[in-house]
Amino acid sequence: MAALRLLLGIDYGTKQIGVAVGQAITGQARELCTLKAQNGVPDWDKVQALINEWKPDAIVVGLPLNMDGTPSDMSARAEKFSRKLNGRFGVTVYTHDERLTTFEAKGERMARGGQKGSYRNNPVDAIAAALLLQGWLDEHPELLNV
């Protein structure tokens, strides 16, 4: 397998999908954007535009597990979404445990001086995507071209 240089991270949700980008050379991930979704289905043209712009070597999709590590109700949907990404765009897709990333992202938003209030009005999905992608980068240095 060729070494990975650039990755996209995705925090999958039924109404919003957070996107982050990470680079092997820095070993760092950062938030990129939040896409709207209808019952878990994104605007595939916008996903295509992100892939065309960033040309990722792989995509890491957050896998929502229960706190005991068992699959949650959303796990199957996230895995199906991962397969669709691979099938539509031919890019390698990994999944990564995303437990507590949204909770941590909300804390990070507050630490940055973000507003309290509705999660839908102040989405943290892209921050959560960056956190899960950072976790994947930290756990898989052997796959990175550093």
Curated annotation (Swiss-Prot):
Matches recorded under Gene3D superfamilies: YqgF/RNase H-like domain
PANTHER family given in the database record: POLYNUCLEOTIDYL TRANSFERASE, RIBONUCLEASE H-LIKE SUPERFAMILY PROTEIN
Species source reads Pseudomonas savastanoi pv. phaseolicola (strain 1448A / Race 6) (Pseudomonas syringae pv. phaseolicola (strain 1448A / Race 6))
Q: What EC number(s) are associated with this protein in UniProt?
A: 3.1.-.-
Query: Which residue ranges does UniProt annotate as crossing the membrane?
Result: none
Q: Which SUPFAM superfamilies match?
A: Ribonuclease H-like
Instruction: Provide the protein's localization.
Output: Cytoplasm
The record ties this protein, via InterPro entries, to: RNaseH-like_sf, YqgF, YqgF/RNaseH-like_dom, YqgF/RNaseH-like_dom_sf
Q: What class of enzyme is it?
A: hydrolase
According to UniProt, the name of this protein is Putative pre-16S rRNA nuclease
Q: What HAMAP family would the database entry show?
A: Nuclease_YqgF (MF_00651)
- Give a GO molecular function annotation for the protein: nuclease activity
State the coiled-coil residue ranges.
none
Q: Which family does it belong to?
A: Belongs to the YqgF nuclease family.
Q: What function does the entry list?
A: Could be a nuclease involved in processing of the 5'-end of pre-16S rRNA.
For this record, the Gene Ontology CC terms, alphabetical, are: cytosol
Q: Which domain of life is it from?
A: Bacteria
Q: Which UniProt keywords apply?
A: Cytoplasm, Hydrolase, Nuclease, Ribosome biogenesis
| Gene Ontology biological-process annotations | rRNA 5'-end processing
